[in-house]
């Protein structure tokens, strides 16, 4: 069985590298963080006799990830590695998928649910790139309890209610004033059983509200925007930062 949290099923279209073919800034900060991670020495407790030599070899052969990603700006063979969307049928065991709206990987939850043909369930909460029991912004959920039930059913053969309810449990956010940190997200939980049945609805903007019919009257709206307006925006893919 599988539990995946904050994941992608397509490394080219859903990851932090390219969106719609456009290069994302995240290539550079994440690539450099990985550079720092890979520079760390091997734990002496694990390799007491060879930790130094293996650490030096790692430094000598270490790739520069931003360079690798920039060398593959279109979908090619490079991105197939780790992209289960290439063939969802390769997965033949139950899957529990979890992510949050404040993370950057939420598109992968509905695409994975639609692509799989195995027992599956999903959560999408209001959270950033964190585990759901830490849930920021709140409300958090009992991820550890649900994970235990998932493992109990599929690894230990214990009958329980882990598949009861909708296939996907999703946090439907209400409109909120912009803040640099949202400690609590306003909204409610809803259930989705079939993502392919979700349809788009076209709404037309008019003065003060959205309407279902196009407004043919000319309107003028004057905005006085503060120069620091962008400072109030939330961070995309907040990696453990509350809100």
Sequence positions of predicted segments:
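Catalytic histidine-centered segment of alpha/beta-hydrolase-like enzymes
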Residues: 128-140
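Conserved alpha/beta-hydrolase "acid-adjacent" motif
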Residues: 103-110
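Catalytic histidine neighborhood in serine/cysteine hydrolases
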Residues: 117-131
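Short secondary-structure boundary/capping segments
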Residues: 17-23, 111-116, 137-143
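Short beta-strand/loop motif that positions the catalytic acidic residue
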Residues: 91, 97-99
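C-terminal, loop-rich substrate-recognition/catalytic regions characterized by aromatic stacking residues
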Residues: 138-243
């Amino acid at each position: 069985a599988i539990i995946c949290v904050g994941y992608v099923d397509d490394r080219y279209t859903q990851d932090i590298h390219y969106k719609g073919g456009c290069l994302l800034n995240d290539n550079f900060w994440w690539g450099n963080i990985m550079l720092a991670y890979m520079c760390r020495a091997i734990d002496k407790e694990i390799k007491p006799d060879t930790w130094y030599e293996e650490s030096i070899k790692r430094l000598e052969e270490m790739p520069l990830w931003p360079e690798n990603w920039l060398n593959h700006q279109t979908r090619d063979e490079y991105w197939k590695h780790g992209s289960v969307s290439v063939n969802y049928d390769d997965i033949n065991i139950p899957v529990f998928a979890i992510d949050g709206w404040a993370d950057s990987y939420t598109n992968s939850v509905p695409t994975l649910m639609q692509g799989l043909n195995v027992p599956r369930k999903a959560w999408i909460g209001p959270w950033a790139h964190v585990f759901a029991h830490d849930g920021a912004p709140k409300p958090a959920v009992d991820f550890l309890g649900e994970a235990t039930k998932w493992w109990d059913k599929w690894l230990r053969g214990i009958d329980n209610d882990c598949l009861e309810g909708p296939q996907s449990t999703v946090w439907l956010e209400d409109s909120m004033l912009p803040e640099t940190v949202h400690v609590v997200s306003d909204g409610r939980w809803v259930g989705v059983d079939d993502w392919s049945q979700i349809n788009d609805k076209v709404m037309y903007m008019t003065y003060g509200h959205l309407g279902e019919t196009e407004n043919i009257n000319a309107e003028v709206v004057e905005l006085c925007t503060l120069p620091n307006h962008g400072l109030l925006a939330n961070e995309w893919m907040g990696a453990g930062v509350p809100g």
